[in-house]
Amino acid sequence: MHNIPAALAEMLRGLAGEAERIGHLHPEQLAIVYEQGWFNLFVPRSYGGLELSLPEGLRIEEELARLDGSLGWTVTLCSGANWFVGFLRPEIARKLFADRRVCLAGSGRPDGVARVIRGEDGEPRGGVGRMSEVNGEEGSAWGEYEVTGRWKYATGAPHATAFTANCRIEKDGVLLENEDGSPVVRAFLFLREEVMIQEDWEVIGMIATASHSFAVRGLRVGEDRCFRIDGRAAFLPQAIYQYPFQAFAEATLAVNFLGMATRFIELCGEVRERLGMVRETFYTAVQDSWEECVRGRGVPTELLAAVGEASRQLADESRRLVDELYPLCGLRAARPGTEINRVWRDLHTASQHPLLRPAIADGSL
């Protein structure tokens, strides 16, 4: 695991209970995160980031999740959103990342609608775009949009400096579709002062992630606020922006299960062998895929599939192992004020994330 100094680790863990009580990361936890640059794990040094490789960043996220589930999850989701710096237009990225406390939050669900605004001549501002352009395959599409939407689960909302969100595109009152019938979706960036935060995060665990909803209504934004998460659309040259987003998301979430399960086992006893074997398989899969990405040859499909499978296996085994041990922990594990109870609640709340949730046999969910 990443070697976080013992005194720092003790301070972060010691503040976890108070962070849960107040419903968001403790100010002293945040101060450490900013000082260490953890929201910028995958941001280039030229933008003030740590510029870590994926395996290096994963080990930090794992260790933070071991110290405090809400802390690890928040750093993971926010550093994942800050990773979008590679796909933002440089003039926008420079302004955002001039703030040492830059922290992006957001949602991947297309729960907003961006209406193409027409100019006086009746044409979309910026010129008429083909369908492939709207989908981000061939540069600028329209020019200006009016966005309305509400998005759930924006981890780190209270301290976010900007928000990202996916929207369907509407033109002439019609929601556009791609040639295969799927909806045309674009990613947008909103500044903090442009959104309304709705404090509705009420769950049994991961309380201090403060994963509230946010909304915009009739917000006008230009084409420079749109971006596409695709290596072909990256503005920055680092290998991390060529690593496929699906595998990146799976791996970064999975290590949080590993960190929380490791801590749960530490609190229960020394039963580590099973989790250790799954951990080794996971990091081997990530390392293999990362090395291919760094070589610039593209990551083979089978290696990406191995990352996905190892991530799901890691999350599933973490859940199973914790649930096997829970009945042996006594009443202290059922008391909300104890660390072992908080770890259990955090892990089981995190396990509801759809990316790594087990498939339902009848396909109903």
Model region roles, listed by residue range:
Residues 125, 327-365:
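Glycine-rich phosphate/cofactor-binding loops in nucleotide/flavin-utilizing enzymes
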Residues 105-108, 167, 189-203:
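Active-site glycine-rich loop that binds ribose-phosphate moieties when present
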Residues 259, 272-276, 308, 312-319, ...:
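Generic structural signal for well-ordered, non-transmembrane alpha-helical segments
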Residues 13, 17-20, 277-313, 326-334:
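C-terminal helix-coil-helix/basic helical segment that borders enzyme active sites and/or dimer interfaces
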Residues 19-23, 237, 242, 248, ...:
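Glycine-rich cofactor-pocket loops
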Residues 203-276:
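Glycine-rich beta->alpha junctions and the first turn(s) of the following alpha-helix
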